[in-house]
């Protein structure tokens, strides 16, 4: 098992049913089922004014994310990796969040359409691909002033 260098302290992870808490030297990150931060506390001060969100419009309507399946992929005293897959009516999003012992975070978000996206060429039936439109997509990080 890797250990962080001095003066940093080992990381700790606590999993709940709907959230996960990752703590390291004087900082705690709380994430919910979609592995986005709901709280960042640094030196006793909350940094976020509201939870982070992935927001967008699909086919002209606001995206509603559902069927979330988060899990801790790996974790030791030096680094923790949290993952999640969630779906809307048209898209699938896979998120991986790596948090290091010094508080550095690396978030990888991949979005892809659900179902068929190209016409079937070699099948018996000619199936039309699902039509979809990703009109807008943005990431909200509401910081306190």
Regions found by a protein language model. Give the residues of each.
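Acidic (Asp/Glu-rich), glycine- and aromatic
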Residues: 91, 98-145
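Short hydrophobic/aromatic-rich beta-strand segments that constitute the beta-sheet cores
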Residues: 39, 82, 93, 106-107
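Residue-level marker for the onset of beta-strands and adjacent loop->beta junctions
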Residues: 7, 18, 93-95, 107
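Acidic-aromatic substrate-binding/catalytic surfaces of carbohydrate-active enzymes
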Residues: 1-10, 16-88, 145
């Amino acid at each position: 098992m890797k250990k962080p260098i001095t003066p940093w302290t080992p990381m700790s992870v606590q999993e709940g049913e709907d959230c996960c808490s990752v703590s390291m030297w004087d900082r705690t990150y709380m994430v919910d089922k979609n592995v986005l931060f709901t709280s960042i506390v640094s030196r006793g001060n909350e940094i976020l004014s509201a939870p982070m969100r992935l927001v967008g419009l699909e086919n002209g309507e606001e995206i509603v994310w559902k069927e979330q399946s988060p899990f801790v992929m790996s974790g030791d005293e030096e680094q923790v990796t949290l993952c999640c897959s969630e779906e809307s009516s048209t898209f699938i999003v896979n998120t991986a969040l790596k948090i290091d012992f010094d508080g550095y975070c690396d978030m990888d978000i991949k979005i892809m359409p659900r179902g068929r996206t190209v016409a079937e060429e070699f099948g018996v039936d000619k199936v039309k691909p699902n039509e979809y439109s990703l009109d807008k997509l943005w990431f909200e990080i509401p910081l306190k002033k």
